């Protein structure tokens, strides 16, 4: 497994993290992102009604290879979720 992440994938990963922060700061939803550099992987999950000890997370992505394409696909999923949330709150 190649553990090196390309510059374009790193940039996309930063965009993904920014979107997670924007969702968490702009809505009642809580968006989490885990980055595992030793595995070259990441995961994103969401609590639509905010985090609580008893709430279940909605898994958005569990990616085992950080590529620009994989990260952009996850970002597209989050964009669709943002559109759904915009009816309730402003992201």
Cite the ranges covered by each PLM segment:
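Negatively charged, low-complexity tracts enriched in Asp/Glu with abundant Ser/Thr
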Residues: 1-41, 50-91
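Single-stranded nucleic acid-binding surfaces, predominantly the OB-fold ssDNA-binding core
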Residues: 47
């Amino acid at each position: 497994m190649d553990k090196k992440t390309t510059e374009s994938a790193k940039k996309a990963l930063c965009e993904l993290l920014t979107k997670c922060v924007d969702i968490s700061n702009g809505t009642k939803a809580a968006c989490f992102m885990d980055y595992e550099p030793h595995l070259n992987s990441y995961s994103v999950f969401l609590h639509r009604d905010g985090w609580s000890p008893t709430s279940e997370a909605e898994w958005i992505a569990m990616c085992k290879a950080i590529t620009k394409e994989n990260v952009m696909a996850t970002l597209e999923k989050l964009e669709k979720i943002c559109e759904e949330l915009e009816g309730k709150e402003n992201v």
